[in-house]
């Protein structure tokens, strides 16, 4: 079973439960995603990766993005179809980059990072694709063509089973549970940032309050407003 299915299966009984709250202090934005909405974006991404790029289990997908709710959907979608998430573009079926970045690769998906989920205002150059505009047309449900084995690489060289075991162990060490609301300012570097800042709270079914471009002067107010119970960093 894929990493995404194993992480989200315990949450399916409460689809309306808030799962990710994303702040961008540079933009002054706040976006909240429920379990259902997160699952929806993951499914759209997985379908798009399979249909547009023929991604199969073990294929590399490069993700060069900040901690963001859109990045969450991309990561979960990639794992759902069995992709191996890597930071480097060489050998990747597709490279996901932000709107101000550029990369020399055969297949590039540009992610607008717009808080409200709008696509790019102008078409990306060089044959690159607008991820949000393209992927939102894909299906809201996804089923892998075949089960994803636990020894499939999922995050650089670590397998599905290894990542899940490590994320659960770190969550247990932190005392995280489904009742927690975890505030994080960690960047989602690959692999450590993604593991500590994204997978650990998911493994505990905790609510993640992720702050990008965090303003230190506003953190205490956010802790109070979001009723967070712990800090991840």
Task: Label the model's feature ranges.
Residues 63-64, 71, 75-103, 109-123, ...:
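Short beta-strand->loop structural element characteristic of the AMP-binding/adenylate-forming
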């Amino acid at each position: 079973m894929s990493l995404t299915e194993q992480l989200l299966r315990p949450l399916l009984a409460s689809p309306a439960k808030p799962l990710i709250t994303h702040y961008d202090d540079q933009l002054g934005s706040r976006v909240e995603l429920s379990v259902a909405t997160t699952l929806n974006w993951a499914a759209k991404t997985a379908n798009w990766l399979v249909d547009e790029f023929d991604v199969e289990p073990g294929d590399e997908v490069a993700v060069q993005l900040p901690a963001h709710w859109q990045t969450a959907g991309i990561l979960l979608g990639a794992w759902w179809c069995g992709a191996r998430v890597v930071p480097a573009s060489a050998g990747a079926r597709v490279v996901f980059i932000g709107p101000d970045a550029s990369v020399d690769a055969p297949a590039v998906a540009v992610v607008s990072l717009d808080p409200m989920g709008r696509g790019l205002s102008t078409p990306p150059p060089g044959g690159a694709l607008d991820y949000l505009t393209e992927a939102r047309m894909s299906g809201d449900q996804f089923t892998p063509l075949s089960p994803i084995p636990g020894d499939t690489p999922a995050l650089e060289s670590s397998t599905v089973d290894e990542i899940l075991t490590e994320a659960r162990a770190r969550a247990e060490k932190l005392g995280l549970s489904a009742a927690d609301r975890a505030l994080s300012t960690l960047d989602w570097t690959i692999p450590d940032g993604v593991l500590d800042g994204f997978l650990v709270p998911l493994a505990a079914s905790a609510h993640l309050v992720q702050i990008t471009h965090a303003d230190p002067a506003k953190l205490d107010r956010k802790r109070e407003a979001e009723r967070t119970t712990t800090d991840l960093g």
